[in-house]
UniProtKB/Swiss-Prot annotation:
It comes from Klebsiella pneumoniae (strain 342). The chain crosses the membrane at residues 1-21, 48-68, 77-97, 101-121. The keyword Transferase does not apply. Its main location: membrane. Pathway: Bacterial outer membrane biogenesis; lipopolysaccharide biosynthesis. GO terms for cellular component: plasma membrane. Residues 22-47, 98-100 are periplasmic. GO terms for biological process: lipid A biosynthetic process; lipopolysaccharide biosynthetic process. It is a multi-pass membrane protein. Keywords: Cell inner membrane, Cell membrane, Lipid A biosynthesis, Lipid biosynthesis, Lipid metabolism, Lipopolysaccharide biosynthesis, Membrane, Transmembrane, Transmembrane helix, Transport. Residues 69-76, 122-126 are cytoplasmic. This is Probable 4-amino-4-deoxy-L-arabinose-phosphoundecaprenol flippase subunit ArnF. Heterodimer of ArnE and ArnF. It is found in: Cell inner membrane.
Length: 126
């Protein structure tokens, strides 16, 4: 069950990253604090993404709490790196994001996957 809690946490934190990114693009910069607060108070575009992005982080932390009670930290922490892969792929494939694809990035993602698989590879006891 700890594995599932960790995967829920990874999914939530990945979605939260994407929501926060879209919110930050839509909201005015914090250097103009008055405009930023007005956007928040009047529920301008970006406000909902900011709210749900922060909520996603909170729910992810709750899932992470349950995951850490049921999984060794070394395995649970390795699963967090899957979030990098999800966010990278979503930023490339989701319409409107226009993130460029680089072969070098794909190599990095492949190394991350290999690392996670190595950590989760069953160890034969003698």
């Amino acid at each position: 069950m700890g594995f599932l809690w960790a995967l829920f946490s990874v999914g939530l934190v990945s979605a939260a990253q994407l929501l926060l990114r879209s919110a930050m693009v839509a909201l005015p910069p914090l250097t103009d604090i008055v405009a930023f607060l007005q956007h928040l108070l009047h529920f301008q575009p970006g406000t909902v993404g900011l709210f749900f992005g922060l909520l996603g982080y909170l729910l992810s932390m709750v899932c992470w709490y349950f995951a850490l009670h049921r999984l060794p930290l070394s395995k649970a922490y390795a699963l967090l790196s899957l979030s990098y892969i999800l966010v990278w792929a979503a930023a490339i494939w989701l319409p409107g994001w226009h993130e460029p694809f680089y072969w070098q990035s794909l190599l990095g993602v492949t190394i991350i996957v290999a690392g996670v698989l190595t950590i989760f590879w069953p160890v034969k006891r003698r």
